[in-house]
Amino acid sequence: VDGIILNSVASYLEKKYFRELASLTASHKKVFVVSLERNLSSYGIFSVHVNNFLGGKIATKYLLEEGCSHIAVISGPKIHDVVYDRLCGYRAALEDAGLVYDTSMIEYGDYTTLSGYLAMKRIIMNGIQFDGVFSCNDQMAIGVLKAMKENRIDCPSRVKVIGFDNTYVSSIAVPSLTTINVPKVRMGTVAAQKLTEMIEGTLPSGEITYEIPIGLVQRTTTDPDKENGIELEDW
């Protein structure tokens, strides 16, 4: 094995694990490692990633611009730095708008549709007043939409919802899901290119990270007039 493209879900607290990964390149038989999605450059691991803080901020700011003032969050596990960064972006957008960051507006899932559904049910049962929902991934957002439908909470007229990732499911959901686009095909392509450069010794000296630009994809969970086109590519 000459190289590994790693998409790790290990806790950010597992510092020893990340240091051991970084040490592979210094071993007798060098094994180069590229991290996908997570920025592990502080450990000396080349990372191809997006700015999750910015993504969380863009998502929240957009909901605010659409008239939402009580935005609930469906987060992934607390131990993941990707989710932490998205939550920090959410908080920053609220504070920029002069709004209070309220932890009672946050529920946690495990990235699955079921966990998003159950998290949304908890928010509803707790009597939390909300007019927007930021889900830290698309799969949980689908669960959010199901829970809202069961409780006759109309989307988007009463509550607007935004996800994160722009996976295929976001374009086929009903209503279709507004989300933050993470160009996963581009990310994988760059990771393979950079790993090849590392193996061949052509990677520029000092280069340790590559950030992929993200963007907002507007669909009908925030604007009923948006096209509900199914995306047949890049999924």
What residue ranges belong to the model's regions?
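An alpha-beta-alpha
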Residues: K57-L99, S104, P204-T222
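Hydrophobic alpha-helical segments within soluble ligand-binding/sensing domains
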Residues: G44-V73, C88-A92, T113-R122, A141, ...
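Alpha-helical recognition/docking segments in bacterial nutrient-uptake
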Residues: V1-K61, M125, W235
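Flexible loop/turn connectors
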Residues: V48-N51, K121-W235
